[in-house]
UniProtKB/Swiss-Prot annotation:
Belongs to the bomanin family. Not induced after bacterial challenge in strains carrying a loss-of-function mutation for Toll. Constitutively expressed in Toll gain-of-function mutants. Keywords: Disulfide bond, Immunity, Innate immunity, Secreted, Signal. The keyword Lipoprotein does not apply. Residues 19-23 form a propeptide. GO terms for biological process: antibacterial humoral response; defense response to Gram-positive bacterium; innate immune response; response to bacterium; response to mycotoxin. Residues 1-18 form the signal peptide. This is Bomanin Short 3.
């Protein structure tokens, strides 16, 4: 069950990184000019 939950969370993170149109994922996608999330 731990492996399934881990795969589920990784899947959600992959979906979040694949949708830059979502305003909540702007910092995750590295579109923010002030914060250096992705170098």
């Amino acid at each position: 069950m731990k492996f399934l939950s881990l795969a589920f969370v990784l899947g959600l993170l992959a979906l979040a990184n694949a949708t830059p149109l979502n305003p909540g994922n702007v910092i995750i996608n590295g579109d923010c000019r002030v914060c250096n999330v992705r170098a």
